[in-house]
């Protein structure tokens, strides 16, 4: 199986609650290698661009407001089967239905304040990684 890369965002709710270390520890325990990281305070334009696929949905303004409310930690994670394994590790978007032991079940507040973002496909991962990182920033 080939090594893949996926984008992870540790979202504002987790950053504000000082959960970065606990979440990074989960990534490393699951065999992910951090190959890039940067702390960002997204602008409105950056948040709108990143979530452009949701711009016609009713929740879009609240999502953007949340994502610019505090810094995020953007990460590129690498391992075999990274996209699928990361999605399994973080759990369902709604923490109330996320599996026991997943990051969202353990740390999220609700479906919007759900602590982490993860790419949902290899194509999304490539696009999302390129949104935040240039190749020279990935090791």
UniProtKB/Swiss-Prot annotation:
CDD domains of this UniProt entry?
NDPk_I
Q: Which InterPro entries match?
A: NDK-like_dom, NDK-like_dom_sf, Nucleoside_diP_kinase, Nucleoside_diP_kinase_AS
| A Pfam short name | NDK
* SMART domains with a match to the protein in the record: NDK (SM00562)
Spell out the Gene3D superfamilies in the cross-references.
Nucleoside diphosphate kinase-like domain
Q: Which UniProt keywords apply?
A: ATP-binding, Cytoplasm, Kinase, Magnesium, Metal-binding, Nucleotide metabolism, Nucleotide-binding, Phosphoprotein, Transferase
Residues given in the record as ATP binding sites: 11, 59, 87, 93, 104, 114
- GO MF annotation: an example: metal ion binding
What's an example GO cellular component term for this entry? Answer: cytoplasm
Instruction: Give the source's domain of life in one word.
Output: Bacteria
Reaction(s) catalysed by this chain, per the record, are: a 2'-deoxyribonucleoside 5'-diphosphate + ATP = a 2'-deoxyribonucleoside 5'-triphosphate + ADP; a ribonucleoside 5'-diphosphate + ATP = a ribonucleoside 5'-triphosphate + ADP
Cofactor requirement: Mg(2+)
Compartmental location: Cytoplasm
Subunit details for this protein?
Answer: Homotetramer.
**Family (UniProt):** Belongs to the NDK family.
Q: Function, please?
A: Major role in the synthesis of nucleoside triphosphates other than ATP. The ATP gamma phosphate is transferred to the NDP beta phosphate via a ping-pong mechanism, using a phosphorylated active-site intermediate.
Query: What PANTHER family does this protein map onto?
Result: NUCLEOSIDE DIPHOSPHATE KINASE, NUCLEOSIDE DIPHOSPHATE KINASE DDB_G0292928-RELATED
Q: Please state what the protein is called.
A: Nucleoside diphosphate kinase
């Amino acid at each position: 199986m080939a090594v893949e890369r996926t984008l992870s965002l540790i979202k504002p709710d987790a950053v504000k609650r000082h959960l970065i270390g606990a979440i990074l520890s989960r990534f490393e325990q699951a065999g992910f290698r951090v190959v890039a990281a940067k702390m960002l305070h997204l602008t409105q334009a950056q948040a709108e661009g990143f979530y452009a696929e949701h711009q016609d949905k009713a929740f879009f303004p609240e999502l953007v407001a949340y994502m610019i409310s505090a810094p995020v930690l953007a990460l590129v994670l690498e391992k075999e089967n990274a996209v699928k394994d990361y999605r399994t590790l973080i759990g369902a978007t709604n923490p109330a239905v996320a599996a026991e032991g997943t990051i969202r079940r353990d740390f999220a507040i609700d479906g919007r304040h759900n602590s982490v973002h993860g790419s949902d496909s290899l194509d999304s991962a490539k696009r999302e990684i390129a949104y935040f990182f240039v190749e020279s920033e990935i090791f």
